[in-house]
Amino acid sequence: MGQIDGEALHWTRQPQAYKLAQDRIEITTEPGTDLWQRTYYHFRNDNAPLLQMQTDKHFFSFSVKTDFSGSHHRFDQCGVVMYLDSENWLKASVEYENEAYQHLGSVVTNLGYSDWATTRIPASVKTMWYRLSRRDDDYRIECSEDGQSWMQMRICHMAEGQGAVRFGIYACSPEDSSFTAVFSDLQMSECTWIAHDGQQPDEQPTP
């Protein structure tokens, strides 16, 4: 495993404007595109463009570098995604907020309800790496500003993530805006998320 062959990638939802090159992928977002299901906001948005590949491997890691220097409008975002269907997916990205800060966060959607976790980072950050790792039906999302030093963002379980899964990249602009997201260094590797070696599961009582 290593650099992902572009022929392995397929549009789950294709944008109007994009470029596929050997060393980079560009997606130009369209206004009013988003991914969210029900929680708090009570709307269901499911029209963001998605470029994904499929695997039945139960242990792997996928990493990608994102460049969102063209993003200047609230909620503009691009990042890593694992989209199984409209009710079951996860994503991680930086969402632009204003000239002072933006949101580095992840959304996990299980059985039709989205769960958002974020932290503020400076608006001056214009690139971010993400790494998605799978261990059976559990998943970890990490981020990095240099592609070398990684920080855990989230560990989660996917209710429908047991078999073959689709994963890749996405970009969207939920409000009235558009920008060009640039993706590079798409890599697939053996799982970098090692098995837990600390506290063991609770023992089940003997009947």
Identify the role of each PLM range.
Residues 1-207:
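Extracellular glycan-recognition regions
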